[in-house]
Amino acid sequence: MSNAEAQASSDHTAPGKADTAPAHNPEADRLRALLEPSVLANRLYLEDVVINVAGSHRVVHVVVDLPQEETGGVSLDVIADISKVLSDALDNDPGADTRPYDLEVSSPGVGRPLTEPRHWHRAKGRIATVKVIQGENVTGRIQSVDDGGVTLVPEIAVKKGMKPKQGDPVKLPFDRIRTGKVEIEFSHLSEDGLEPEHNGPSEEA
């Protein structure tokens, strides 16, 4: 299996309670507290829990990632394994309502905004565009990350068809960073046109 953004889903009917609200609500927080120990026990990080409701049906979307000190992406095999673990946890959830649900488990993928220090750690070695609060925006390769901020080696554009030049390293404190986004490097794409560690196929179970 390739390392990739991956997804697995399974359909269930859960035992018994009341109404579920939309994403980023107390029910999502409750499920996060329920599922996080299982995610951590499998050496993963629980990035997010989102609940979408459509009539009598609900979708529980769980986003998992590798710990910040690891490199690469979450493989489809890992997604499939953690999906089974989380499915069992939801089936045995004493606080669940009676509506059927789909469980979707995925990894963040290359398009995730870099909004937390751990996101920057996970993106080390990648090229990112950083919008700063004051001053010019910076596009460069993430060289290092520490408690204070991010050090990038700027990519300086030259003539079309020529490889960009590297500038002097720039240290950006976290409190100066508005947003960050990893840029796709086409030279790193696999034969199917996908970045092997960050984008990829979906899997349904």
From Swiss-Prot:
Pfam families, A to Z: DUF150_C, RimP_N
Chief localization: cytoplasm
Keywords: Cytoplasm, Ribosome biogenesis
Lineage of the species this protein comes from: Bacteria, Bacillati, Actinomycetota, Actinomycetes, Micrococcales
Residue ranges with Polar residues bias: 1-12
Keyword Cytoplasm carried by entry: yes
Subcellular location: Cytoplasm
Recorded family membership: Belongs to the RimP family.
Protein task: Required for maturation of 30S ribosomal subunits.
Protein origin, superkingdom: Bacteria
Any single Gene Ontology cellular-component annotation: cytosol
HAMAP family: RimP (MF_01077)
Keyword Cytoplasm: yes
Record-given protein name: Ribosome maturation factor RimP
A biological-process GO annotation: ribosomal small subunit assembly
Region listing for Disordered, in residue ranges: 1-24, 186-205
